[in-house]
């Protein structure tokens, strides 16, 4: 048998399908026809994410999203009803949007959508269901926070922002516990039931009447109101600085090194995400090669941007043994400084280009992935050809453009270092790094 690999074929070109838009009452249907794709994905986007929650109702988005799954009849009735049509419910909340949806066979879409519309517009919202879901979320919060990496990420908001972003998306244990069934009902009536939103539909649309789908989902709901946006202020305090979230006796530490970043609309995405990939977004990234391959401190280290409508965050993260914590922090910051000073290599440039262009036909090969891209466009007011523009931006990347991105988007001098670990063991080594003042907090005191 031959022992050589067959030659690689030419890279397939890719263009994101152009969506069609249909205005129906107070809402808009955004659809992509994919002939032969018999599993249709529908997503309803409301612009009421966690960022616009009032401070006395933090977490109401997440709790309402959970409660909708109880359906119009309550007591977790929605999933079995949808299953009779081969459909599956989905719901999620982020800082900028409240997204509900379903995946259903094309020949059962109409029946499934009627159930979906009832669940979104006319849910039971039984007080017992709301209290049950709230208690489940509270229990889940601390179960998830038992993982050091999760606790570190949830501790980050209050170090970078004041206002809503200072508390985790789910509201934190104290704020979430204060939400009553009446609060959920009021939020749902004002922000979900009475607001049409945008309906994303992707799949084989032969025989599917988009206008009728829109009428079923939107009903007489009003159009989406304008959202007021303002950049949240940072908390007081010296930068850079270190926060230790104390876990006595822990033999490992979870690290997050982060700083504020521009909003989604303010960044050149290929340049910003490209330089993040060089630093920590690939196996061959600078952080992984240093902390994992050379020093042997971790199984993996990474970095990425979290870009929102009104602000953003850049962060690096890893988990290491306690005794290597301080050196891991300084080594990570040194990698950023070196990247800002010396720039990227030609090999890194090629890797960034190829990883964000070659795989696009596979990345957008399913109705769900196409729907996800359309939801992103709706949430961030992106043009219909956003994916193609983004691909072209990656293809245009040069060493010079990535080098300038390193100095424009990476700011270690503004960083906050969050370490979850044994404070007694970590305080002095982290103080000795000279990064900045070191504060120690107990996890239960973070979200009072």
Where are these regions (language model features)?
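M16/insulysin-pitrilysin zinc metalloprotease superfamily fold
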Residues: 71-74, 102-136, 282, 302, ...
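Histidine-acidic residue clusters that define the catalytic metal-binding segment
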Residues: 2-22, 158-197, 229-234, 360, ...
């Amino acid at each position: 048998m031959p022992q050589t690999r067959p030659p690689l074929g030419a890279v397939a070109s890719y263009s994101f399908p152009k969506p069609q838009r249909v205005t129906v009452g107070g809402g808009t249907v955004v659809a992509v026809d994919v002939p032969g794709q018999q599993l249709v994905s529908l997503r309803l986007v409301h612009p009421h994410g966690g960022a616009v929650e009032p401070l006395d109702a933090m977490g109401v988005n997440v709790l309402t999203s959970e409660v909708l799954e109880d359906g119009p009849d309550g007591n977790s009735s929605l999933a079995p009803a949808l299953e009779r049509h081969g459909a599956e419910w989905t719901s999620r909340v982020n800082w900028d949007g409240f997204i509900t949806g379903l995946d259903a066979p094309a020949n059962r879409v109409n029946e499934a959508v009627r159930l979906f519309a009832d669940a979104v517009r006319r849910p039971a919202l039984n007080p017992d269901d709301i209290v049950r879901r709230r208690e489940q979320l509270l229990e889940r919060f601390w179960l998830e926070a038992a993982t050091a990496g999760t606790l570190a990420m949830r501790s980050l908001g209050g170090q970078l922002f004041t206002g809503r972003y200072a508390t985790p998306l789910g509201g934190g244990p104290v704020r979430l516990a204060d939400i009553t069934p009446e609060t959920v009902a009021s939020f749902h009536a004002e922000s979900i039931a009475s607001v049409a939103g945008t309906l994303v539909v992707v799949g084989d649309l032969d025989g599917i009447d988009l206008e009728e789908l829109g009428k079923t989902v939107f009903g007489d709901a009003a159009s989406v109101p304008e959202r007021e946006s303002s950049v949240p202020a940072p908390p007081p305090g010296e930068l850079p600085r270190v926060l230790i979230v104390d876990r006595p006796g822990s033999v490992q530490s979870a690290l997050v090194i982060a700083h504020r970043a521009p909003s989604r609309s303010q960044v050149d995405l290929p340049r910003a995400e490209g330089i993040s990939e060089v630093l920590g977004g690939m196996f061959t990234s600078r952080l992984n090669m240093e902390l994992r391959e050379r020093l042997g401190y971790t199984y993996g280290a990474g970095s990425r941007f979290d870009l929102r409508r009104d602000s953003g965050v850049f962060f690096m993260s890893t988990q290491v043994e306690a005794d290597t914590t301080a050196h891991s922090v300084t080594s990570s910051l040194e990698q950023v400084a070196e990247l800002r000073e010396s720039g990227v290599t030609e090999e890194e440039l090629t890797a960034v280009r190829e990883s964000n262009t070659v795989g696009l036909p596979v990345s957008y090969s399913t109705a769900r992935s196409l729907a996800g891209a359309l939801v992103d466009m709706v949430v961030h007011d992106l043009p219909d050809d956003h994916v193609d523009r983004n691909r072209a931006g990656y293809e245009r990347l040069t060493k010079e453009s990535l080098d300038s991105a390193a100095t424009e988007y990476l700011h270690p001098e503004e960083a906050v270092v969050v370490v979850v670990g044994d404070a007694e063991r970590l305080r002095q080594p982290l103080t000795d790094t000279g990064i900045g003042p070191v504060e120690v907090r107990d996890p239960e005191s973070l979200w009072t």
